[in-house]
Amino acid sequence: MIEMFTQIFIISALVIFGMALLVCLVRLIKGPTTADRVVSFDASSAVVMSIVGVMSVIFNSVSYLDSIMLIAIISFVSSVSISRFIGEGRVFNGNHKRHR
């Protein structure tokens, strides 16, 4: 009985995450501004991390958690880089001097 509820919960979670990912990808493609695309990319990476987490529960394996961490790091770095590019026009600051 409990296994049936668990299976229904996992399947419904995957369906909801799939619909959320579809909405995020539509906004990523059609987004009128770059900021919309950055936000939708960040949201879609969070949805992908959630899907991988559910798959980790399904397969009863902790090896998927490393990929969740990798997706989170790549998403954070890319969001910060694109936001700096939108704000300043460049990713790296070239106004620093080297100390010798």
From Swiss-Prot:
The chain crosses the membrane at residues 5-25, 38-60, 65-87. The keyword Membrane applies. It comes from the Bacteria. Its main location: membrane. It is found in: Cell membrane. One of its GO terms (molecular function) is sodium:proton antiporter activity. Keywords: Antiport, Cell membrane, Ion transport, Membrane, Transmembrane, Transmembrane helix, Transport. GO terms for cellular component: plasma membrane. Disulfide bonds: none annotated. It is a multi-pass membrane protein. May form a heterooligomeric complex that consists of seven subunits: mnhA2, mnhB2, mnhC2, mnhD2, mnhE2, mnhF2 and mnhG2. Belongs to the CPA3 antiporters (TC 2.A.63) subunit F family. This is Putative antiporter subunit mnhF2. It comes from Staphylococcus epidermidis (strain ATCC 35984 / DSM 28319 / BCRC 17069 / CCUG 31568 / BM 3577 / RP62A).
